[in-house]
Amino acid sequence: MRVLITGTSSGIGREIADKFLEEGHTVTGIDRREESIQKDGYTHICMDIRDKAKYPELEPFDIVINNAGVQNEDDIDVNLKGTIGITEKYGIHPGIKAVLMIGSA
């Protein structure tokens, strides 16, 4: 399957990406920080999910996992608006199997 995961540079997002890669899936990670995963089947997009104008055109995904999040004054823009933007751009199409939202505080 083709999987898109936001927030893959560390923590939960990185662990989820590693698990999908171990199972042989193709993973695209989006994060503000540079690539931290160096494995076959992984593609990294370094960008801020708040900037919808920079969302690249990508082939459809089977699974979209919204994991990126912050705990500061930008929380609404990242945790809510960024999640909505990613879901609208990549998670709404025929053939999508799942869209997951991860949140923590």
Mark where each language-model region is:
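Conserved N-terminal Rossmann-fold NAD(P)-binding element of oxidoreductases
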Residues: 3-7
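N-terminal Rossmann NAD(P)H-binding glycine-rich loop of SDR-like oxidoreductase domains
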Residues: 9-18
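Conserved glycine-rich Rossmann-like NAD(P)H-binding loop of the short-chain dehydrogenase/reductase
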Residues: 23-37
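Conserved Rossmann-fold cofactor-binding substructure of NAD(P)-dependent oxidoreductases
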Residues: 43-60
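Conserved NAD(P)H cofactor-binding loop of Rossmann-fold oxidoreductase domains
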Residues: 67-72, 103
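A short, exposed helix-loop element centered on a Lys and neighboring polar residues
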Residues: 87-88
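Catalytic loop of short-chain dehydrogenase/reductase
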Residues: 98-105
